[in-house]
Regions:
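Short, Lys/Arg-rich amphipathic segments at extreme N-termini
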Residues: 1, 10, 216-217
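Beta-strand-rich binding/interaction modules
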Residues: 4-21
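Short, well-structured beta-strand segments within conserved domains
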Residues: 8, 46-48, 183
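The feature marks proteins involved in alpha-glucan
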Residues: 1, 18-107, 112-117, 124
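Substrate-binding/active-site clefts of carbohydrate-active enzymes
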Residues: 94-99, 109-276
């Protein structure tokens, strides 16, 4: 709602603010902008961002609902990426019911679940780790660090892009294949989801999305978490609740996660963030 003007920029228009890519403000909705594009105006793999202009400033931002975000290997800059493969993944396991008597949970991190000194992938986890998890008698995995995050050392807890599976580990199709294979083995997949806070980063995340540092977060002293160096969502705003609840729905419907482990619940419930 704080934006004065928004342009869609990317590979398709040489990252320039062009009239045909200028977005329109929807008057009947507070703070909603839209754009109608010609067919094939954007293609699979194109990088893009929003150029947002506000009173006294401007900035390039990744859309909050972007479902694919990648980092340039040279510049290290993150951008949203159009993800519309010609052959999207189709789940083979149509119906899955987790065994919960008892539920044996194996907590894991895709990037760290391998022997080599590198970041592991969705495919490597599916091929090498899932069989060992099943052989050990577990019937559920709790997967960490799925949502995109700029700092790998945060273990995935400083999330910047809530709808984007981390591209460090591979593609969305490869994550879907991992979950599908787990279900085929009788293993439920729980996502370690982060809705208690967000990374401070402005260029990659939601920290100052349109010149309003409080658009998604509490104002004043409650905005920053005193221990995590991150920003706290304002759950009193319907728009924030819609954003987070739709995020849960997205992961369950698009990727078929079976449930969630919500990180930092005490911080969501208590004014002192559960720190005492």
């Amino acid at each position: 709602p704080n934006a004065k003007d928004i342009y869609l920029i990317g590979d398709f228009n040489n990252w320039q603010m062009k009239p045909e890519y200028r977005m329109k403000k929807v008057k009947r909705f507070n703070g909603t902008w839209e754009i109608e594009l010609k067919p094939k105006a954007m293609k699979h793999g194109d990088l893009y961002k929003l150029k947002i202009i506000w009173e006294g400033g401007e900035g390039e931002r990744i859309p909050s609902y972007a479902n694919r975000v990648v980092q340039d290997e040279v510049t290290k800059i993150f951008s949203a990426q159009v993800w519309a493969p010609e052959k999207p993944y189709h789940f083979r396991k149509k119906v899955f019911r987790a065994k919960t008597d008892p539920l044996m949970i194996y907590e894991c991190h895709v990037g760290m679940s391998q022997q080599e000194e590198k970041v592991g992938t969705y495919n490597e986890f599916r091929e090498n780790v899932l069989p060992r998890v099943a052989a050990a008698g577990y019937n559920c995995i709790q997967v960490m660090a799925i949502q995109e995050h700029p700092y790998y050392g945060s273990f995935g807890y400083h999330v910047s892009n809530f709808f984007a599976p981390s591209s460090r580990f591979g593609t969305p199709e490869e994550l879907k294949q991992l979950i599908d294979e787990a279900h085929r083995m009788g293993i439920a997949v729980i996502m370690d989801i982060v809705h208690s806070h967000a990374v401070k980063n402005e260029n990659e995340g939601l920290g100052n999305f349109a010149g309003d540092p409080n658009q998604y977060f509490y104002p004043g002293g409650r905005r920053e978490h005193p221990a995590w160096d991150s920003l706290c969502f304002d759950y009193g705003k319907n728009e924030v609740l819609h954003f987070l609840l739709s995020n849960c729905k997205y992961w369950m419907e698009e990727f078929r996660f079976d449930g969630f482990r919500f990180d930092g619940v005490t911080s969501m419930l208590y004014h002192d963030h559960g720190l005492g």
